[in-house]
Amino acid sequence: DTSEITDMSQLFYYSEFNDIYSTNEIGLHNGDISNWNMSNVTDMTCMFSGAKNFNGDIGNWDISKVTDMTRLFNGATIFNQDISNWDVSNVTNISYMFSFTNSFNGDISNWNTSNVASMDCLFYFGIAFNSNINKWDLSNVKSMVAMFSYTKLFNQPLNNWDTSNVTDMKSMFWSAKKFNQDLS
């Protein structure tokens, strides 16, 4: 029963998700977590960070109280599940959330990002990501450092973004080879 848990940070940090379970190897896990009650969780920092084999169905989780998703899927190289219906309206930090992901290209266009303040390195080395996020509300974002750096495929319009409160965009598109959009 996970209904009372508020902090899931680093829960599966560098865990091996596969179809082998051994009591001698604590890091191995392949249980179904799709029905976990996440309704009281506020911190998902690094929850699946480095879990390179994780690709579980977690799209129905109620994460409406979560405020921090820093490095949530950082290095979860095969993760590519539908999380389009996640309520991220209370999240303030999504830095490194999809960094070093090789497969993620989910539709997250309708996420309510109005409370997010930091998007640093959000898609840093995000190999497959090329979804349209032009409708995101960035009115509270302060920092977007290296947000799309080293993305391989990203080339979507961002002309609807209000970046008037952003104070740091250092290296935002550094080595984003495909990006070629009008930012005027």
Segments the model singles out, each with a brief description of its role:
Residues 1-184:
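Negatively charged
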